[in-house]
């Protein structure tokens, strides 16, 4: 008898596919921040197509990593606490954004990450934030990291850096 068929219920390495979509629970504020970041991306490129939320997040994460490297090179660091501390209205004023609708409050929003690389990058960023004790480990969840990345992207880079 040939043993070419694996037993039922077993998983072969060839049948495992990377996760390409992941829903992350966020505050409703994240949806608004994504629209503001998308507007900034469209304004800074010649592409008039609206970017997807995942594209916006990937661009913002790349920008934040560049900010972090520049801050390290200047023997400084990003002031994560200052970026996350204010409420949304105060943040909008700090980042020179239009005022956000009051209805956003803390209602939930499901952000769907698309792409295995982005999913992996967001979870790796959460691990880095926890490892460096930037925030309490309980706070460093994907939804919080997404909000942080979008806020850093929308702030003036000089305001986000701290010597």
What function would you assign to each model-found segment?
Residues 2-42, 82-124:
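Short Lys/Arg-rich basic patches
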Residues 44-78, 129-163:
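Short, basic amphipathic alpha-helical segments that act as recognition/interaction helices
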